Amino acid sequence: MANYLAQFQTIKSSCDRIVVAVEDVSDLWLNVKESFEQRLPVKKACLNNKARNPVFVENLPAEFIQTTDSRLRSRFPQDQYLFWFREPYATVVLVSCEDLDEFKTILKPRLKLIVQNDEREWFIVFVSKAHPSNDQASKMAKRVYARLESDFNTKKRERCCKFDLHGPDAEFWDDFDSKMVDCIRNTLDRRVQFYEEEIRRLSEQRFTPIWNFCNFFILKESLAFMFEMTNLHEDSLREYDELELCYSESVNSPGKHREFGGLDTGDDQAALLNPGFKALTQIVQDDVFREFEFRQYIFACQAKLLFKLHRPIEVAARGYAFVVSFSKTLALQENGLPFCFREVWVITACMDLIKATTSHYDGTAVAIDSEREFCRIQGDLYSLCRIKFLRLAYLIGYGVEIEKSPVNSASLSMLPWPKPATWPSIPPDSSAETMAKEKMILQAKSREKIFNIHRKPLPLEPSLLLREANRRRAFLSVGNISELYDSGDGSGLDANSKPSPNKSASNYMARTMSGPATSETSLPVDRPMRLSEIHVAAEHALKQTVSDPNFMTSLSSLEEFEKRYMELTKGAADNYHHSWWKRHGVVLDGEIAALFFKHENYDLAAKSYEKVCALYSAEGWEELLADVLPDLAECQKILNDEAGYLTSCVKLLSLESGLFSSKERQAFQSEVVRLAHSEMKHPVPLDVSSLITFAGNPAPPLELCDGDPGTLSVAVWSAFPDDITLESLSLRLSASSSADEGLKAIKSSDARVLVPGRNIITFDIPPQKPGSYVLGALTGQIGKLSFRSHGFSQDGPVDTDEFMSFEKPTRPVLKVRKPRALVDITPAVSSALLMNELQWIGLIVKPIDYSLKDGILHIDAGAGLKIEESQMIEIETYGSDVEHVGGTDASKTSSSSTDTRKVEKVPIEDGKIKIPDWASDVTTLVWFPVRAIDDTIARGASPASPQKQSIVDGMRMIALKLEFGVFLNQVFERTIAVHFTNPFHVSTRVVDKCYDGTLLLQVILHSEVKATLHVKDIWLDLQSGFEHTGKGDGRPTSNLFPLVIAPSSRAGILFVIRLSALGDMDELEKADSMLNIKYGISGDRTTGAHSPVPVKPDDSEELVFKIAVKMKRPVLDPCVAVGFLPFSSDCLRVGQLVNMRWRVERLKNPEDASLLADEILYQVDANPQNWMVAGRKCGHVSLSNKQGSRIEITVTCVPLVSGYVHPPQLGLPHVGEANISCNPAGPHLVCVLPPTLSTSYCIPA
C-alpha cells in the first residue's frame, strides 16, 4: 500500500470538495447545469460525525460531475476502496419522458439497470419540458411522473422529485437539497465505517513484524481528509491527533536506526504552517517517515484545521508547546545537525506562529479572558524567540554590547551553548575579521554607573564559551588553563576584572604555546582557538546553516542586531502587558530601557525604568531593584528631573544596607541633602517611610484626662548612614477607631539632628478628644523640602535593631479618658440658714484622682444674696483626709495636739479664691460668709390668712466655677441652691371668749431652723379694732423669758385682747398686727443656721425678728343668714340640669346704713371646668329691711365632670363676711355620677 503514497498525495492536492455524480439519461445536463450549480455550496446540511451524532454543517463544498467525465471513468477499480474518499457521495439521475409507453418500454428498464448498484446513493430528478400553456403535455408529464414515483419510491424513502424546466418552484429546491444531503450522509456513514474497520485491522498489527506505518497513515489521513472535505473539522482534527500519537509510539519504538532529517537546504526554516513544504515521498524511509519533516507536517495539518475552526488561540498554544518539545528533540539530534540549527529553527517557528495567529485572530469576537490568554502565549513565543536570538548574538561576539541584566542572566544561564559534534573551525583568510572581533572585545568595557556603584556582574552563560568551544574541537580535548579561563570576552564570572600588566606576557605565551609543556614532542597539533576566532568561526558556520538572507541580515551588524532585538523584546513586553502576566512585560521593559539608555534616549528609558522599579519595589525584590534603580536615577539626573532624582536617591537609601557599600550610601545621602537645600523648581514632599521610622516607648501609654496637655516620648529610628539635620519635626496622632489623620500636627520647633539608629524625641501634646490614639505620621522638613513618614516600627529590645518592622502598631501610645468628674463640689449644709443675717456657707471640694494645684474657685452669688468679702475665707480638711493631711504637716505633729485638722484663712477678691497647694489632693471644706436679703415682712398664719410661706421664697442660687489643671484648662461649673428661712413661723388663733368680751389669743412659735432659739422678749403691736387689756404694753400675760425653743419644736404664748371701736372698714382689712421677737441662736455652721458672723467686734448677739399677723374680727352679731337648701335629686349626673338653691334671711336691722337697701347684690362662683351655669351668675334680689324677711335664690347648673367636685358658692359682695352667718352651711364636696349609657350609639355584636 505504501506504493500508492505518491498517488495519494496527488489525489489529496487535487480534491478539495465532495463529488456528486450526474447520470444524464435524457441529455438534460446542459439545460439544468446552471440552475443546479447555483445551489452549491449546500447552505445547510445535517451530517453525522464519527460518533454518529448529527452535526449541522454550513456551506458544504460540493461539485457536480457527469458520470461520463474522464475524472470518474479513468479510475482503476483496485484503488477505488483505497481512495474511496474521492468517489461520488451521491448520484443524481436526470430523466425526462413525454409518453407513458416510452417510459414503460425504454426508460424504466434503463433506470432499473442504473440503480441496481447497492453501494451507490441515488435519487431521480424528473425534468418536465411541458409548457404551462400546454395542458395536454402537462397532464401527460404528471402521469409519467406519477408512474415514476410508484415504481421507484418506497415506504421508507422517496427517491423522486420533479423539476419544471420552464419555472421550478422553491419547494423543488428544498426537496432537491434534502434528498442530496440524505445521499451524502448515508455515503459518508458507510465510508467512515469502512475506514474505521480497516484502521482497526491495521492497529491490531502494530506490534507485529508486518506493521507498516505508511499504510496506516494513508487510511488514517484518508479518513481525516474525508472529514475535512465535509467540513467536519473537529473529527478531522481528532484523527490527526490520534495519528500523531501513533507516530510517536512508532518512531520511539526500539528497532533499526532511522534518519531524523533536517539536513536538506531550507530545513532551518520551520514549516509548521505549510503542510506542502515537502512531498511525502521525499520524507518516507522504509515503512515510516522521517521525524523532522513528518512532525511538522502533522502539526501543519492540525493548524490548518484549527484556523478553519476559527481557533487561532489554540494554534498559538499548541504551537508553543510543540516548539518547546521539538526543540528538546532537536537537542538530542544536535550532533548530526548543522551548527546552531536548533536555535535558528526555533526562531523561525516562533515568528511564523506569531504572524499566522495574529493575522487570523479577531479580538472583537472573544472574551476578555481568552484575549489575555492569547496575548500571554504570544508573549511566550516572542520571549522564546528573543532568548534564542540573544544566544546567537553571544556566539558571534555581540554579547559584550548586551545589558547584563537579571532577566538576561536568568534566561541565558539555563540555556546551554550549542553542542555540535565538532566545533566549527576558523575559515582561511579570516584574519581581518578576527582582528575586528579582537578589537571589539578589547574596547568593550562595562558602563560605569552613577555614584561609582560597583556590583558583581551576573553570569550570563552556564559555562565559559572559550572552554566549551575548545573542548568540542575534535583534535584537542582541553587547552591551557590560562587560555580556557581567559575572561577578556566579558562573558565570564569575572567579566569586570581587567588583567594585570604582569600577566599580559604570560597570556600571550599561553595563546601561542597552549597545552602542557613537558617536552617538545608533547605539543598539540593546533593551539586552542582564541575567543575572537571562536566568534568568527561561529559566524561563518551560522551563515552556512541559515538559508534565509533576511534572517542573516539581522546578525550582519550590531545595529541590525539591536534593531531586531528591540522588535522581539517590545513584542514580548506589549503582549505580556495585555495578558495575565503583566509583571513579565514590566521586566522586559527594563531591557528596552537599557537599549534606550545606550542610545541616549533618556526620556523613554526613564519611563521604562520607572515601571520596572515600581514592580520590583512592590514585590520586595530589593536585589533586583538595586540593579535597576541607579540607572533610573542617572536618567533623571541627565534629564534634570530633580524631583524624580531625589525620590530615587531616597529609595536607594531605603534598600537593604548590605546591597551597597558605606561610601555609596553616604553618596546617596549627600545628594539628598544637597537637593533638599537647593532651590528646586518644583519641590515635592518626600516619603521617607523606609528611612525614618518611629514607635512609642515600650512603657504603658500616656494617660491624660479630657482637656489636659501632656508630653509624649517617641522613639525615632534613622536609616541614614550619617547624621542628618531636620529643620522641623511634627507628629500626627490617629484615633485607633478610625484611620483618619485629621488631628492637628504636633510640632517640635527645635532643629533636630537624627543620628543613625535610635533617637528619643519628646512632643508637647495639646488637649485631645477622648479616645485611644496611635502614631499616625511623622512629618518634617529637611532643608527646604518637607517629608512624611508612615514607617511604623514594632517595639523591641532597645539595644538591638531587630525591632524594625513596617507593620502598623496596634498598641496605643496615648489614652485620653472620656469626660468624667475630676472634682465634685457639694454644699456642706443641707438645712436652712437665717434670712437677712450673715451666715457661713460651706462647700465640700473633693478632687477625684486629679490634682487641683493652682486652682481658682469663682463664686458668683445670685439675686438676693451678697458675699461679704471683708471676711476671710476659711479652708479646712474634711472627712477621712484629716489624718492624711495632718500626718504630712509638720506643724500639726506635736504630741500635745490631738486635732490634726488643718485650717487656713485666705482672702476672697472679686469672688475668686485660690486653692492652697496642700488642698489640691485632699477633700476640703471651704467656708465663706453670705447674707440673704429679703425686704418683705414675714407673715404669720391665722384663720384669716391660713397660707404658709413657700420654701421657694427662701431659695438662693450660688454659681460656682473651678478652674484647675496644668494650664487651668479644666473647668468645673455647678450652681447650688441654698435655703434661707426666718427663725420662726408664727400662727395665731383665738382659744376662748370670755363673758366680759375679752379674747384669749394664742401665738404659736414654730422653730424653722436646726438650732436652739433663745426667746428673750416678745411683744405684739395690734391693728385697729383690737386692743390689749391690762398694762397695754403688748407683752404676754406670763413672763417666762428667756424661753428656749429646741430645733424643729414649737412654743405657745397667750395674749389677752379685746375688741375696740371700728374705724374705716377698708383700713381695717389692710391693717396687720406686728409681732416682735427678740431672740438669740446657738447652732453649728456644719448643721445649718448659726449665730451671725460678727462684722464688727462689738456687734451684739441679740436679734430681733418681726412678723406680721393678720387678725380678723369674729362673727359675733350677724345681720344676714345664708343657708344652702338640699338638692331635689339624690344623685347628680354629668350633663343633667341641677337647681342650686340658697335661702337668704335678714336676722336684724343692720347698724351700717349701707346695708339698709331693699336690694342685695348676689354672685355665684363656680369652677368653669367642673360646672356650667345656665342662669345668671350675678344679679340683684329684693330683700325687705324687716327682721325675719326671707328670699330664695335659684340658679340652674350643669355638672361637666364626674367625681367629687366643689359645688358653686353664693356670695354677697356688699355684705361683709362679719355680718353673714352660714346656716345651714353648704357641702364642701358633692358627688357627680357619669352620664347614663346612650343606646343609640351601641353597635350590636
From Swiss-Prot:
- Which keywords does this Swiss-Prot/TrEMBL entry list? Endosome, Golgi apparatus, Transport
List the disulfide bonds in this chain: none
Low complexity composition-biased segments: 495-507, 888-898
Top-level taxon? Eukaryota
Q: Give a yes or no for keyword Glycosyltransferase in this entry.
A: no
Q: Which GO terms describe its cellular component?
A: cytosol; early endosome; TRAPPII protein complex
Region annotated Disordered sits at 488-524, 884-903
What this chain does, per the entry, is described as: Specific subunit of the TRAPP II complex, a highly conserved vesicle tethering complex that is required for the proper transport of proteins in post-Golgi trafficking pathways to the growing cell plate in mitotic active cells.
The subunit structure is: Part of the multisubunit TRAPP (transport protein particle) II complex composed of BET3, BET5, TRS20, TRS23, TRS31, TRS33, TRS65, TRS85, TRS120 and TRS130.
Its family remark reads: Belongs to the TMEM1 family.
UniProt-recorded name of the protein: Trafficking protein particle complex II-specific subunit 130 homolog
Originating organism:
Oryza sativa subsp. japonica
